[in-house]
Amino acid sequence: MTFMRVFAVLIFALATLGCGSDPSGSNNASTVKATATPTPTNTVPTYTYEVVNTFPHDPQAFTQGLYFHNDFLYESTGQYEESTFRKVDLKTGRVVEQRKLGDDFFGEGLTFFGNKFYQLTWREGTAFIYNADMTPAGEKRYLGEGWGLTHDDKNLIISDGTHVIRFVDPETFKTVRAIVVNREDGRPLINLNELEYINGEIWANIWHSEEPQILGRPNHIARIDPANGKLLGYIDLSGISPDDERRDKENTLNGIAYDPATERIFVTGKRWRRLFEIKVKPKQ
């Protein structure tokens, strides 16, 4: 991604992305400014992991969003003609209930907020809303791409594959504010993908982080300060599921879920055969 493209995407994101049900209607996005990123630093820590438990995962699931709720995993899977919203038994990996998206929709990020599930789509500009029992509860329209999705105590939080993360009103889908995330050397940290809000931080999977122009390190998650976009650290998950990664270069890490009651953290990837409960710890 060139500098001009990054700059253009940033301007476009802040000016137009936060629309409501009518993408052609007026909204307040033009008044929203991204929070300035702190001065670049080279002291960003890297964390590693310990596998606590391993669970089965559907190897056909092109995981794009993952959420833990009431002892079940809820998953958004992607690919045209294959995308689903599903409820999964954690221990067995069995799909308990599933809703298939239309063939023209590519499922993306997923979260649960205000007793509703929200599921983004990639380039279709549609967010699907479901009740807690997975029955449809409506749709919202937005401009731009949808990648990762999480929430804080007030807003939905959306990534679009750039280094911009937006905070969006769940009722109107208008952008309330936005942050930009830079690497420790000051360059944009692009390809921010699946998101999870954990203990006051945004954890963002970095899609294809192994690419030199992205990060040059495989299977990394960024820890981000939601107040200002400051990069708080990386989680190095390289080597966690080598067999899955070797099967296809697109079988990338892409699924983070958190159980706040027990502080369990779960990760998986696209078409991975396993889901991992991990403990994050400082890297020695």
List the predicted regions and their residue ranges.
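Conserved beta-strand positions in repeat-built beta-propeller and related beta-rich domains
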Residues: E75-Q79, F117-E124, I158-T162, A204-G216, ...
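C-terminal motif of bacterial Sec signal peptides marking the signal peptidase cleavage site
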Residues: A15-G18
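A short helix->beta-strand "capping" segment at the edge of beta-propeller domains
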Residues: P38-Q60, L90-V96
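Beta-rich, blade/repeat-based domains predominating
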Residues: P59-N70, D103-F113, Y142-L156, G186-E201, ...
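Short loop/turn segments that connect beta-strands within beta-propeller blades
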Residues: V88-G93, N131-T135, D169-F173, D225-G229, ...
